Amino acid sequence: MTDPEHSGQRAQVRGARFRERVLDATIACITEAGVDNVGFADVARKAGVNGVSLYRRWKTVPRLLIDALLTRTQAEVPIPDTGSVHRDLEIFATELTKFAQTPIGTALIRFTVVSADSPEVDVSRREFWMQRLTAAEEIIERGKNRGEVDSSTDSRLVVLTLGGLVHIYVTHLGTDIPTSLPHQAVSLILSGVTSGVTQARTNAQMG
């Protein structure tokens, strides 16, 4: 039998507070049961809300999972803006590396790479990566605008290179990610995407 008082409390949860409670509960369920074993009923119980309200807002479990994982990723791996492309990339890579080695980070990576038969899951995965890639690409675009990076640099390729390194460690190597990886990877990448700028400055000084 439903507790009237508890039902009243659930009914009062609305808007941003409702979303925050549900997403926190989703993350907790992922941590406890694994990303493949989370359903609306589990999250509703954990959040203390009506399961129907979850369906009305997110429609499917994959969309709820993506919302929760993307929100947590944005909080744990923000896009830095220090005024230096080298510093921004190194901070981004460092935070990404740390996050990838947490239970939620590992769950996120595995959720977005393991194949599934559900078209909805595939759409949600693509949506997640498009949002994250677009956000991270701003680091390179700002570097271009400041003249730190060659204007012909493929921003997405840079981000994919950094992210790909981290993902390989988590999904294939199964070993701790070296603490030196962010610095080494960023230095290697920047040696290529800043070479034209460096040469142009050298030519200007000689001229």
From Swiss-Prot:
Residue ranges of every copy of the HTH tetR-type domain listed in the record: 16-76
InterPro entries, per the entry: Homeodomain-like_sf, HTH-type_TetR-like_transc_reg, HTH_TetR, Tet_transcr_reg_TetR-rel_C_sf, TetR_C
GO molecular function: DNA-binding transcription factor activity; transcription cis-regulatory region binding
Protein name: HTH-type transcriptional regulator AqdR
Free-text function comment from the UniProt entry: May regulate the expression of genes involved in the degradation of the Pseudomonas aeruginosa quorum sensing signal molecules HHQ (2-heptyl-4-quinolone) and PQS (2-heptyl-3-hydroxy-4-quinolone).
Induction: Up-regulated by PQS.
DNA-binding residue intervals: 39-58
PROSITE patterns, per the entry: HTH_TETR_2
